[in-house]
Design a protein with these regions (language model features):
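Conserved anion-binding
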Residues: 1-69
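Short, basic/aromatic-enriched C-terminal tail that caps enzymatic domains
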Residues: 117-127
């Protein structure tokens, strides 16, 4: 979690813009900002956050809807992935809710370069 955009600028400056990914954390499609006392939903659009991160010089994006994480309900980020890839030519990875090979393929078909899998592996789901 970043306290300010200047933190991301420092990270990109230190590591180089070809080595930093920006994680767009969502909850039911809305951006989430993490505070010490828990997450807060942002009133800014996902696209506005990505615009800012891209202007700072990130190398790629991770899109994850936290409402999908551990749900085994399937990923919900496909339409947003497609929308972001129309505007940005960056590597994009996505996760949350992935249950099986079909979900992996759906995320890849939406245009993601890769898929983040966690709970499905820990629970022994057949990927």
């Amino acid at each position: 979690s970043l306290d300010a955009w200047s933190d991301l600028e420092k990270m990109v400056g230190l590591a180089g813009n070809d080595r930093v990914l920006f994680s767009l954390d969502l909850h039911q499609g809305r951006p989430v900002y993490h505070l010490d006392n828990g997450p807060r939903l942002e009133r800014i659009s996902p696209e506005e956050l990505v615009d800012r991160a891209v202007s700072i010089g990130v190398a790629g994006l991770l899109v994850i809807d936290l409402a999908d994480v551990g749900s085994a309900a399937g990923p919900s980020t496909g339409p947003l992935i497609q929308q972001l890839l129309v505007k940005y030519r960056l590597p994009l990875y996505a996760g949350g809710g992935v249950r099986d090979r079909r979900d992996v393929q759906a995320v890849l078909d939406a245009g993601a370069r890769g898929v983040l899998i966690g709970t499905a592996v820990h629970k022994g789901f057949q990927i």
